Amino acid sequence: MVFIESLPFTRRLHELAKTDAVEVLTAIQSDLLSNPERGRLVPGLGGIRKARASNPGRGKGKRGGFRYFYLYFESDQQIALVYLLDKDESDDLDADERKLLRALAAESQSEE
């Protein structure tokens, strides 16, 4: 499986997870390797899925941690990590974030 990180995902990962960024990324990749379709499809976002990851800095587990958004390209065995939210900040996407993710999904699918 090949993992691809969008620039918005990488920025948010380092902004939110800070010194735990590598640990969070490793946990996300491990979860997706065991089940790439684990996240639920988000309606209207072109195949983007949403799943949870824990925030080791808080020690709260997945429910109080991060929400990450990704695309799974089964035929290419690729996963594109597209965005990350902190549960304390928001449990879901605002209109601007939805617009960004639709654009990232369209761009990723056109490259496939």
What are these regions (language model features)?
Residues 1-62, 75-76, 90-112:
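Basic, Lys/Arg-enriched alpha-helical interface segments
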